[in-house]
């Protein structure tokens, strides 16, 4: 029974780690460089509300979850649930700091996402980037490359040791419905995102 509980905790921890690594990227401890132009700045900060599913693998741990991510005006809120709908955590962040809250009422607060993941998971996970990567853009502050498909849409983005591969449901759809993120440095990780709703 104890081994089963440990395995279950391991899966939830791996899934939460992946979600934390991928979520809430607007609040960072880095000072970003200025965007190339006003249009890029607007796109980088544009609000969105997405819902979908993810699966994550890091080392021998893996897990899956559903998520709803709301991003607006430098504030983010991510609700994580098991595939059967059981709440895993709510993650929130803004300029004042970041928080993780579990269903049993436990709350952990930190100044940055790196600090929060270090305290809750035992390892600092870089969380800058995903809000830009979702839109097929390299995040400001570090070099990145974007390869485009025949329709001019992002096909592969590489930045910060991550490779993000975009898949589209058809040739006419401008936004990717599936993203595969691979990290090959240090502890390799792979995260697959399926976006069911994007507003």
Residue ranges and their predicted role:
Residues 1-29:
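Sec-dependent bacterial lipoprotein signal peptides
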Residues 21-44:
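Bacterial Sec signal peptide processing site at the extreme N-terminus
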Residues 44-83, 88:
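Post-signal-peptide N-terminal segment of Sec-exported extracytoplasmic proteins
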Residues 67-70, 91-93, 166-170, 197:
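Extended lipid/amphipathic-ligand handling interfaces
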Residues 75-124:
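An acidic-aromatic
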Residues 104-157:
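Flexible, processing/modification-adjacent segments and terminal tails
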Residues 139-199:
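Gly/Pro-enriched, hydrophobic low-complexity segments
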